Amino acid sequence: YWVHMDKIRPAVVLTRDVALPYLSNITVAPIFTKVRGLRTEVIVDERNGLDHESAVNLDNVQTVSRDSVFDQIGLLTFRQKRELAWAIVLAFDLEIRLRDI
């Protein structure tokens, strides 16, 4: 999705789909063009509707107004969703083993 944050940028919506119509705020992970190779990043690219390789950054999760989120760009693959789950575990320092997710 495109999201109004510090500027209009792509982001992954982390809030579950079923809750979206009922919430005034939505949690998102911004996508940055700079890929730093961190374990708290998930690589996305043209397959996901972007112009070039970028990184979903789970160290910068934000909650924004639902009105700030617009125009779906693309979808994550199953593998990227698993990587996203693991990046969340690492970013929030959760005590979960990889095989548990």
Each model region followed by its residue ranges:
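Compact nucleic-acid interaction/catalytic patches
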Residues: 7-46
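C-terminal terminal-subdomain/extension
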Residues: 48-101
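Short coil-to-beta transition motif at edge beta-strands of beta-rich domains
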Residues: 1-3
